[in-house]
Amino acid sequence: AALWQSQYLSQGPEGKSQKYIKNSCVPEIYAGIDYKHKGLLIGAGIEMVSLTPRTQATVEDKIYKVSERITSLSYEVHMKYNSEKWLVAAKSVLGSNLTQTSMLGGYGIKSIDPRTGEQEYSPNRNSSSWINIVYGKTWKPAIFFGYMKNLGTSDAVTNMYGTGTNVDQLLSGTAELTYNVPHWKLGVEYNLTSAWYGSLNHSNGKVVDTHSVSNNRLVATALFMF
């Protein structure tokens, strides 16, 4: 599939913007394969995004045209099992600069041409995985667990553009119970999310000197479906 950004945008020197992919003239490319057998689905995919963060730079009050590009690859595997009473789904992503998908990450500046101000970049990589398990028909208990780890960059960087680039790891767990009858769904859900924040290690783009912040959330729902 060839994809263009509209509502969900990549991060860059000017925050979230469509101009990075517009100036790149290269759409996002995704290729995947799925295997299905009865209630089981297993698949994998690869995604490429190529962005142009800037087209000009200013050095000593002079404006220079620059040719910048950052291209990154991301990989994912996924599975889903569905039976009369069971639903099990899981996914794991090795991501690189996936801010347009609401993921944490981005890219950093690895070098600057002192004459023209042209910059070269190194993408931030992270690993994220989640699993969701649901059982039952009328009464449905369910659990969800997700984890994300910042893997840093391949090169030394001086500055980062992205989302949550000061987060080292993120952990989220959810337990819920729903009561399901025709046209109605009643439920309660508890979620605990913890994030470990810190400072950028410029030598590898990782986050160091971390401390954790946790959030507790309790949600009750009543849905009428027609």
Question: Can you describe what each PLM-predicted range is?
Answer:
Residues P27-A31, L73-V77, S127-I131, L171-A175, ...:
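Hydrophobic, lipid-facing positions within transmembrane beta-strands of outer-membrane proteins
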Residues Y35-H37, K80-S83, Y135-K137, Y179-V181, ...:
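Residue-level signature of outer-membrane beta-barrel architecture
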Residues G39-V167:
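Detector for outer-membrane/organellar transmembrane beta-barrel domains
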Residues S154-A156, W196-K206, T210:
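A glycine-biased, small/acidic residue-tolerant capping/turn segment at secondary-structure junctions
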Residues A1-K62:
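Aromatic- and glycine-enriched pocket-lining scaffold segments that form the walls
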Residues V181, S212-F226:
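Outer-membrane beta-barrel "beta-signal"
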Residues G173-G198, H211:
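C-terminal closing repeat unit and adjoining cap/tail of repeat-based domains
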